[in-house]
């Protein structure tokens, strides 16, 4: 990899680091029952997450799954997770990968950059940012 390519990868990693720092974690609530889930959803119309979780006997989590005794997973009402993932991937690829591709010296290097940058964007948008790497 030439110095141009290395500079491009470094810039990408720096930008991803800045984006990661600004990502807001979307809260998820886990409730023991459908009744608890409905209680939480109604409460959230006016109440704070922590208050509603306590009143309705739910737990707040930032993970992808709920504890076994809290099986009902609820995304916040303003969440549209599949669209969010799609737009995250699209934005990441268009802003970061385009820059890196322009730094490629030849077609072979460009294909490698496109693949690695695309994989990094997928990992980032699926919350696997700790696993994201552009190294071959």
From Swiss-Prot:
Tagged with keyword Disulfide bond: yes
GO CC terms, sorted: extracellular region
Residue ranges the record assigns to the propeptide: 73-136
Pfam family, one: Thionin
Entry's Gene Ontology BP terms: defense response
Source organism, top-level taxon: Eukaryota
Keyword Disulfide bond: yes
Disulfide pairings: 30-66, 31-58, 39-56, 43-52
Residues of the signal peptide: 1-27
Keywords, alphabetical: Disulfide bond, Plant defense, Secreted, Signal, Toxin
Single GO MF annotation: toxin activity
Location(s), subcellular: Secreted
Family: Belongs to the plant thionin (TC 1.C.44) family. 4 C-C subfamily.
Function of the molecule: Thionins are small plant proteins which are toxic to animal cells. They seem to exert their toxic effect at the level of the cell membrane. Their precise function is not known.
Protein name, entry field: Purothionin A-1
């Amino acid at each position: 990899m030439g110095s141009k390519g290395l500079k491009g990868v470094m810039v990408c990693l720096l930008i991803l680091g800045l984006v990661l720092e600004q990502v807001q974690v979307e809260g998820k609530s886990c409730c023991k029952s459908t009744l608890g889930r409905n209680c939480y959803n109604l409460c959230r119309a006016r109440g704070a997450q922590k208050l509603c979780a306590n009143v309705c006997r739910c737990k707040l989590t930032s993970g992808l799954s709920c504890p076994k005794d809290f099986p009902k997973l609820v995304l916040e009402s303003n969440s549209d997770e599949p669209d969010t993932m799609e737009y995250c991937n699209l934005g990441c690829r268009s802003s970061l990968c385009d820059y890196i591709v322009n730094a490629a010296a030849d077609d072979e290097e460009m294909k490698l950059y496109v693949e690695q940058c695309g994989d990094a964007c997928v990992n980032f948008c699926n919350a696997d940012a700790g696993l994201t790497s552009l190294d071959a």
